[in-house]
């Protein structure tokens, strides 16, 4: 299993407004190896919200297929790489990991 986490820092109060956009469903669900998406709001005392958007895949290759897909392009169209003062997004970091041990 392969898990990708996009850690996104947003202005305080915006995480709960933005979270449904990541879990509304769509073409990602039809892609080979896709398992699920979860959005977490990190519980801390920061002056900003930190969201973790976690996607689970059967393999790294399946995740790479998502990155190359039309579904990925459609999900991210209109997103500017340049930050504006109006954007609630303060920054992000993507973390990729192979699950090497699990207890269910």
Swiss-Prot record:
Subcellular location field: Cytoplasm
Alphabetical GO biological process terms: heme catabolic process; iron import into cell
Catalytic activity as recorded in UniProt: heme b + 5 AH2 + 4 O2 + 2 H(+) = delta-staphylobilin + Fe(2+) + formaldehyde + 5 A + 4 H2O; heme b + 5 AH2 + 4 O2 + 2 H(+) = beta-staphylobilin + Fe(2+) + formaldehyde + 5 A + 4 H2O
Organism: Staphylococcus saprophyticus subsp. saprophyticus (strain ATCC 15305 / DSM 20229 / NCIMB 8711 / NCTC 7292 / S-41)
One example GO MF annotation: heme binding
Quaternary structure (record): Homodimer.
Residues holding Fe cation: 6
Binding site for heme: 76
Domain spans labelled ABM: 2-95
The protein's enzyme class: oxidoreductase
Keywords carried by this UniProt record: Cytoplasm, Heme, Iron, Metal-binding, Monooxygenase, Oxidoreductase
Record bears the keyword Heme: yes
Site (Transition state stabilizer): 66
E.C. number(s) listed in UniProt: 1.14.99.48
Function per UniProt: Allows bacterial pathogens to use the host heme as an iron source. Catalyzes the oxidative degradation of the heme macrocyclic porphyrin ring to the oxo-bilirubin chromophore staphylobilin (a mixture of the linear tetrapyrroles 5-oxo-delta-bilirubin and 15-oxo-beta-bilirubin) in the presence of a suitable electron donor such as ascorbate or NADPH--cytochrome P450 reductase, with subsequent release of free iron.
Keyword Ribonucleoprotein part of the UniProt annotation: no
Protein name per the record: Heme oxygenase (staphylobilin-producing)
One CC-aspect GO term: cytoplasm
Matching SUPFAM superfamilies: Dimeric alpha+beta barrel
Membership in a protein family: Belongs to the antibiotic biosynthesis monooxygenase family. Heme-degrading monooxygenase IsdG subfamily.
Gene3D superfamilies: 3.30.70.100
């Amino acid at each position: 299993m392969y898990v990708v986490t996009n850690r996104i820092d947003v202005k305080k109060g915006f995480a709960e407004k933005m979270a449904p956009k990541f879990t509304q469903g769509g073409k990602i669900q039809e892609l080979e190896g896709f398992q699920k998406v979860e959005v977490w709001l990190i519980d801390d005392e920061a002056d900003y919200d930190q969201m973790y958007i976690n996607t689970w895949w059967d393999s790294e290759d399946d995740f790479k297929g998502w990155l190359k897909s039309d579904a990925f392009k459609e999900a991210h169209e209109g997103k500017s790489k340049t930050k504006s003062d109006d954007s609630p997004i303060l920054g992000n970091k993507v973390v990729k990991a192979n699950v090497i041990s699990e207890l269910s």
